[in-house]
Regions:
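Aromatic-rich juxtamembrane segments at the membrane interface
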Residues: 2-8, 17, 105-227, 232-233
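Internal transmembrane alpha-helical bundles of multi-pass membrane proteins
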Residues: 5, 11-20, 28-36, 75, ...
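C-terminal ends of transmembrane helices
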Residues: 56-58, 189, 233-237
Length: 405
């Protein structure tokens, strides 16, 4: 309960709200106000804020107890918020200008090192998918594994997508915070399990970003890796666990990089889910007092799922017009299954290069086939479970809004 009380409204949260207001205003007024207009408008609040600051310092030297100081600080803060509003408008109009610019096709030789790395990673990912195909697994089993582990949802058919959507588990088909978190924890475990070790955290974060590059920089993975990087900074600073203030910092960084992130459904759902977990999870978790680690783990999983649903449910209803009635139950299958699938995929990734060692090749191939059989069994199980769930009476409430249909 004490943890709940510490979630105060901070300047970073105010910054993020005002920045968001500036971005939205600039997007819908772009036809009338360009970047030059917003730069010109921003001069006034900057000037007033600077004048208020200098007057405050001057009065403090001569009369520190003057009441005028409070008013000047108030005006200074007000104009700083206007400056932040203009900053959001400026970066938004600049981003729109960039999007409207003619597309230039570059030759491979003129690409930057980073762009070449992305292309090489794409080739490497295609080779990994082809290697999975050679292991002779079902089409939709492969599709689910490729979606979860490599961010490639192109092989998923409509029936599978619909089954996962109705059962409330479609989030595990996109590489997002859940997947990045699982991989991050696995890497820390493989490196010795020291969560506060600087070397472990730096290496784990670097490997996570290498993984994001490997799967082709999908927006959800980049978003999750950015939030994870900020979480890593919190761990390295030896401060308490992340709060809403940390989330606000992640939000500001990602919005400054790309202001149009705020209009992305996945972006909105990610931040609402994490914010809701930070707010409600401690409140729910403390309702059950048990000394059993197993019961606490199950209860913790339920509390995380419930807290995330509270935050994302309004968006799901608004955008999709659907409520998945069994999502809290299916999460007990989806999250452990996703964890096992990712762990086994990492094991396959580690074993794969060893097949080129002649005296180990036959043993490694047999072990890989065993891992693949387990992986396929898990995938078949969750595919069947979620299809059956989607067929249950009252599995979802549809067409809540007429416009959603």
């Amino acid at each position: 309960m004490d943890r709940i009380k510490k979630q105060h409204f901070t300047p970073l949260m105010s910054f993020s709200l005002v920045l968001t207001a500036g971005i939205i205003t600039a997007k819908y007024s772009y036809d009338y106000l360009s970047m030059r207009h917003w730069l010109a408008i921003s001069i006034l609040p900057w000037s007033i804020a600077a004048c208020c600051y200098m007057m405050t310092q001057l009065i403090r030297r001569h009369n520190p107890s003057s009441r005028i100081i409070d008013k000047l600080i108030h005006y200074q803060c007000l104009n700083l918020y206007l400056c932040i509003f203009c900053l959001g408008s400026c970066i938004t109009t600049h981003h729109i200008d960039h999007l409207n610019a003619p597309v230039q096709i570059k030759a491979y030789q003129s690409l930057s090192s980073f762009e070449r790395t992305i292309l090489k990673a794409q080739d490497f990912r295609q080779q990994a998918e082809q290697q999975l195909h050679t292991l002779h697994i079902g089409e939709q089993d492969f599709a689910v594994i490729a979606a979860m582990a490599m961010g490639d949802k192109s092989a998923l058919n409509q029936e599978t997508k619909e089954a996962y959507s109705i059962s409330g588990t479609s989030h595990i088909l996109a590489v997002s915070g859940l997947h990045i978190g699982i991989i991050f924890q696995l890497i820390i475990l493989l490196l010795g399990g020291k969560r506060r070790s600087k070397l472990t955290i730096i290496l784990s974060t670097t490997i996570v970003w290498a993984y994001v590059i490997f799967i082709g920089f999908p927006a959800s993975a980049v978003r999750a890796a950015t939030m994870l990087s900020i979480y890593s900074m919190v761990l390295l600073s030896l401060r308490p666990d992340p709060t809403l203030n940390t989330l606000a910092l992640a939000y500001i960084i990602m919005v400054l990089v790309n202001p149009f992130n705020i209009f992305d459904i996945g972006f909105q759902m990610s931040f609402l889910a994490v914010g809701s977990i930070l707010l409600f999870y401690p409140l729910f978790f403390c309702l059950l007092s048990s000394h059993s680690n197993i019961i606490r783990a199950i209860w913790g999983l339920f509390c995380v799922s419930l807290a995330a649903q509270i935050g994302t449910l309004p968006l799901i209803v608004f955008y999709f017009g659907r409520i998945s009635c069994y999502s809290l139950i299916t999460s007990f299958i989806a999250i452990p299954a996703a964890t096992l699938i990712l762990y086994l995929c990492v094991l396959l990734f580690i074993l794969s290069p060893l097949t080129y060692i002649s005296f180990l090749a036959s043993s490694i191939e047999g072990l890989m086939q065993l891992v693949m059989n387990v992986l396929t069994s898990i995938t078949q199980f969750i595919n069947t479970a979620f299809r059956l769930t989607s067929l249950l009476p009252g599995a979802s409430i549809e067409c809540i809004f007429p416009c959603s249909s």
